[in-house]
């Protein structure tokens, strides 16, 4: 089963039958329109390419326009591809959120919020050094980052200050709380990566 591309609307909470508050992320999943079907003979693997949303005609390049016209679909805000195993799709076909009706858990992939250049405490959860007791300069610094003349260098992969966020992140096995087909919404328990209105990819959980 393939996944779908949606848009993170934000977080809220709903109450179950026992009155327990459940934190949920609302994902809007408009119809995913098939723009290309890749086959083993032509492409060396099987996959389906989809688009969703809409893009102003003035923002669509000529190659993109030709691609969308060939598929017989309206230009979308991007193109995404899902590998297929035996499923059959046709150009212009619309895939909706109702495919998750019988799914219990999903994996959600998005681009995490960019935090810029951050230190070791925020980036790696390092503990801070003494606030007093003679320490006046090194409250949030890393401390030792190596050994001695041997090896005489800092090992690759050492956790240090640097750029945090703005990377592809997948959160696995999020429970589906509700599928609202009419409003094209998917409610999953917990948080998902990315800012409000960012694109996310929702797939059936691999560990379910």
Swiss-Prot record:
InterPro entries: Ribosomal_uL3 (IPR000597), Ribosomal_uL3_bac/org-type (IPR019927), Ribosomal_uL3_CS (IPR019926), Transl_B-barrel_sf (IPR009000). GO terms for molecular function: rRNA binding; structural constituent of ribosome. Methylated by PrmB. The keyword DNA repair does not apply. The modification N5-methylglutamine is found at residue 149. Pfam families: Ribosomal_L3. One of its GO terms (biological process) is translation. It comes from Histophilus somni (strain 2336). Part of the 50S ribosomal subunit. Forms a cluster with proteins L14 and L19. This is Large ribosomal subunit protein uL3. One of the primary rRNA binding proteins, it binds directly near the 3'-end of the 23S rRNA, where it nucleates assembly of the 50S subunit. Belongs to the universal ribosomal protein uL3 family. One of its GO terms (cellular component) is cytosolic large ribosomal subunit. Keywords: Methylation, Ribonucleoprotein, Ribosomal protein, RNA-binding, rRNA-binding.
